[in-house]
A protein has these predicted regions:
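C-terminal "cap" of GNAT-fold acetyltransferases
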Residues: 160-172, 176-190
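Conserved beta-strand edge residues that scaffold enzyme active sites
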Residues: 81, 152-153, 182
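Active-site rim helix/loop that mediates acceptor-substrate recognition in acyltransferases
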Residues: 37-73
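Conserved acyl-donor/pantetheine-binding loop and adjacent beta-alpha core of acyl/acetyltransferases
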Residues: 53, 65, 69-72, 78, ...
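Conserved acetyl-CoA-binding loop-helix of GNAT-fold acetyltransferases
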Residues: 112-117, 123-140, 170
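Conserved N-terminal entry element of GNAT/NAT acetyltransferase domains
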Residues: 1-46
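Conserved GNAT acetyl-CoA-binding A-motif
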Residues: 131, 138-158
Length: 190
């Protein structure tokens, strides 16, 4: 990775075309069954919306609407003008899929819920750069805690869609608690 040509931009109306190019393109070439998500899963209240019935077209439209209304947040890694990575990170109160998992001081918690790096660019440190940008962005919004839910036993890139546990631990996150499904919650003070 050339550090001089890699940049990270926050999702916005202006950067939305980069997000769409990445998600419409080869981002999921090694995991096509998830290509319909457009990082909308955590924005939905699953008591209201049946996620399994949400189509790619619907999710793409919702991503556009939410990005334009500043109700969806995340960071896009660009190599020049080519999108090569994505990190979904937002204040917890925007992520309605987490509504049934209350946490103390939720208004101060930013959740990192998605990592996606172009398959041909994995292992180059792009996720680390995205994680730093996500933490900086959450801090700038007044969040005092960054939280994520990685899978310790991840065997594939798809299993690491919340980000690799090793990435978080090497970036100053610590295990906050274990979940019944074998995953862990990690946190970092911002």
């Amino acid at each position: 990775m050339s550090s001089t040509s890699l940049s990270v931009t926050k999702l916005s109306t202006e950067s939305l075309p980069h997000f769409l190019k990445f998600f419409d393109g080869g981002a999921f070439s090694d995991n096509p069954k998830w290509s319909s998500c457009y990082c909308q899963c955590f924005y939905e209240n699953h008591d209201v919306v049946k996620w399994s019935e949400c189509t790619a077209e619907r999710n793409r439209s919702m991503a556009c609407n939410r990005a334009q209304a500043e109700e969806m947040q995340g960071y896009i890694a660009l190599e020049g003008q080519e999108p090569v990575g994505w990190c979904g990170a937002a204040p917890r109160h925007l992520l309605h899929a987490l509504d049934d998992e209350p946490t103390p001081n939720a208004e101060a918690v930013g959740a990192i819920v998605c990592f996606l790096v172009a398959p041909h660019r994995r292992g180059e440190g792009i996720a680390r750069v995205l994680l730093e940008a996500a933490c900086d962005g959450l801090r700038a919004q007044g969040m005092t805690i960054a939280e994520a839910n990685p899978r310790p036993d991840a065997k594939t890139a798809a299993d690491n869609h919340f980000g690799p546990l090793s990435l978080y631990l090497s970036s100053g996150f610590t295990v906050h608690r274990e979940d019944a499904d074998g995953s862990v919650y990690v946190r970092h003070s911002l």
